[in-house]
């Protein structure tokens, strides 16, 4: 898969006709994968290229929600798994004031050489989100033709699968539910210096900060897994303000990696979240905290058996 930054791409970067998958693809959940799959299949059917068109950050929603499920790097990795030929990355501010017709001719027909597209039933484009999937289909039909595949709504139980639903689940600590939606929550960040209090207690931990663009999960303790090089280790992660040992109010991640001993400061580690265990507690002593962590470790080991 080739990655194209639309700010710097050459005018003939995509020289053959293409089928463009349209969406923010934040979290790349099962509904997004349907859109990407349809673009891939239509492109293969017509012997041309498939393109995923997306943004380098999550556009601000009307409710002010901007927390991303995936960073741009995580999004690229997920889209690559779908077999797409190109991912075209744009900046939302550069196109947000284009009319639907301007977006169609400048971006789709012009830059991306699109003869077809794939989108979800609720896809919006044009200034003020003034046009939707049906208007996109009409623009193709009225301007030389081209197929537009519109994916239906996907529901699980009473819930519509969407990035908004997934962000809500993350903030409620329901990270285990994300797997049934075709996505997950993880944090990839550098290991920074902590106060070494846990290490002095015989429970070494790594400290990380959640990237500012990411949605922050419910504060508390989680069963997690750490990727270190080619190896994966079960772990227990606390997301929060460390109420027993600190009161500066700064949210961070502190992870005890089970079965690992090594120097990780300065390295970037991915922590995958699997299950919420409990909220933050203020323990009466460090010994009581130690006992609770040992209990959480046992739960983590049992979870991955």
Question: What name fits each language-model region?
Answer:
Residues 2-10:
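Short acidic-hydrophobic, aromatic-tinged amphipathic segments that line or gate anion-handling sites
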Residues 9-13, 94-97, 154-159:
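A short acidic, often aromatic-flanked loop/helix-cap motif at beta-alpha or helix-coil junctions
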Residues 9-71:
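N-terminal catalytic cores of NTP/NDP-binding nucleotidyl/phosphoryl-transfer enzymes
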Residues 21-23, 53-54, 87-91, 116-121, ...:
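Short beta-strands and strand-loop turn motifs
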Residues 29, 79, 117, 178, ...:
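Residue-level signal for inorganic ion chemistry
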Residues 59-143:
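N-terminal Rossmann-like or analogous alpha/beta NTP/dinucleotide-binding catalytic cores
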Residues 140-238:
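Glycine-rich, Lys/Arg-enriched anion-binding loops that position phosphate/diphosphate groups
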Residues 194-305:
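Phosphate/ribose-recognition catalytic cores of enzymes acting on nucleotide-derived substrates
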